[in-house]
C-alpha cells in the first residue's frame, strides 16, 4: 500500500455532471478505498490536447496498491473523453521522504528560525548585519583599487576602518617596460 496523487483531465465538451460521472466510473476501480477528491474546475488549456481547448480538472488523493492504480491508468487511457492522466507515488517523492526523516525536519526548523530572525532584523532596521561584524565585507577584503576609491569618496578618515595609508597611484594604467632599455641590454650582451 502506497500513497498516490492522481490528476485527471476530462474533456471540456462535457458538462460538469458528465465529467463527474466519468471520474466516478474510474474511481470504482479502487472499491472501498478512502479517496479525497478535489474538483479544480474547468480551465482553458495552454495548447490543444486531442483537438480540445478546455478540460475539467480532478485531483485524487488515496492509499492503494500498485495493481489497482495500474488498472485505473489502463481504463483511463481507453476512454476517449479523458485527455490526460498523471499518477504520482508521493512516497517516492523526495519531499515526502524528507518529511518522515527526523533529522531533516529538525534541520528545516532550525533554518526556518534563522530565516525568520533575518527577516525580522531587515524589517526593523532596513538591512541585515551579521552578528559580531561591524565592517562591510567588501571593505574588509578590499584590494588597493577599492581602498583608493573609498579614500576618494570619504576622504582620509574612513568610517570605522583601519586601512594603511596609500600613496596616490594611477591604478587604472599598468606600467609597461621600456623597450629601448631592453634593446640596449641585448646589444651589450651580444658585444
From Swiss-Prot:
Cellular component (GO) terms are: ribonucleoprotein complex; ribosome
**What molecular function does GO assign, one term?**
structural constituent of ribosome
Which BP terms from GO are recorded? translation
Superkingdom of source: Bacteria
For the region Disordered, give the residue spans.
168-191
What keywords tag this UniProt record?
Ribonucleoprotein, Ribosomal protein, RNA-binding, rRNA-binding
Q: Where is the composition biased (Basic and acidic residues)?
A: 181-191
Coiled-coil region(s) at which residues?
none
Q: Which NCBIfam families match?
A: S6
Role description: Binds together with bS18 to 16S ribosomal RNA.
Spell out the family assignment given in the record's similarity comment: Belongs to the bacterial ribosomal protein bS6 family.
Name under which the protein is recorded: Small ribosomal subunit protein bS6
Question: What organism is listed for this UniProt entry?
Answer: Mycoplasmoides gallisepticum (strain R(low / passage 15 / clone 2)) (Mycoplasma gallisepticum)
**What is the taxonomic lineage of the source species?**
Bacteria, Bacillati, Mycoplasmatota, Mycoplasmoidales, Mycoplasmoidaceae
